[in-house]
C-alpha cells in the first residue's frame, strides 16, 4: 500500500490577500477629530490653539500627499518625453505603412501635441515614435 490515509494529510493552505490600508485618510482623521471634540471634558475643553494646530498639521499632510501624487504623475508623463529627447541628433529608421521600403532621417526635435508625441526630422517630416524601427548614431 503506497497511499497515505486522509487522516494523516495536512489541510490545504488557502492564500489570503490582506487589503489593510495602514494610511490614515482625510475621512478617518476628521472622524477622530470629531470624536475627540465630542468626548472632551466640558470643564477642560480643547484649547483653540491646539485644535487649529491639529487642523494645520492635517492640512499640511494632505497637501504633501497631493504633491506626491502630482509629482508621480509628472514623472510618469515625462518618461516617454525624456526617451524621445535622447533620440535628438540620432538617425531613425521608420516606416510610414504606405511604402514597402524603410525611410531614414535624423531627429531634430520632439513635439507633444494633444497627448501624442511626434519626432520632427531634419527635413521637417513628423513621425510617430510607434513607427520607428531603429535608432542609431547619425551618419552625418
Curated annotation (Swiss-Prot):
Keywords (A to Z) from UniProt: Bacterial flagellum biogenesis
GO biological process terms on file: bacterial-type flagellum organization; bacterial-type flagellum-dependent swarming motility
Region (Disordered): 1-21
Keyword Magnesium: no
One Pfam family this sequence matches: FlgD
InterPro entries assigned: FlgD
Protein family: Belongs to the FlgD family.
Protein name, per record: FlaA locus uncharacterized protein YlxG
Gene: ylxG
Amino acid at each position: 500500500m503506497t497511499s497515505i490515509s486522509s487522516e494523516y494529510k495536512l489541510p490545504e493552505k488557502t492564500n489570503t490577500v490582506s487589503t489593510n490600508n495602514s494610511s490614515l485618510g482625510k475621512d478617518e482623521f476628521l472622524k477622530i477629530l470629531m470624536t475627540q471634540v465630542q468626548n472632551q471634558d466640558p470643564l477642560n475643553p480643547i484649547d483653540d490653539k491646539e485644535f487649529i494646530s491639529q487642523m494645520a498639521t492635517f492640512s499640511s499632510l494632505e497637501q504633501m500627499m497631493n504633491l506626491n501624487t502630482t509629482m508621480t504623475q509628472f514623472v510618469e508623463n515625462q518618461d516617454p518625453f525624456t526617451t524621445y529627447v535622447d533620440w535628438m541628433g540620432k538617425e531613425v529608421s521608420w516606416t510610414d505603412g504606405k511604402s514597402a521600403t524603410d525611410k531614414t532621417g535624423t531627429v531634430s526635435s520632439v513635439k507633444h501635441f494633444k497627448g501624442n508625441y511626434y519626432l520632427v526630422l531634419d527635413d521637417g517630416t513628423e513621425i510617430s515614435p510607434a513607427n520607428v524601427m531603429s535608432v542609431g548614431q547619425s551618419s552625418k
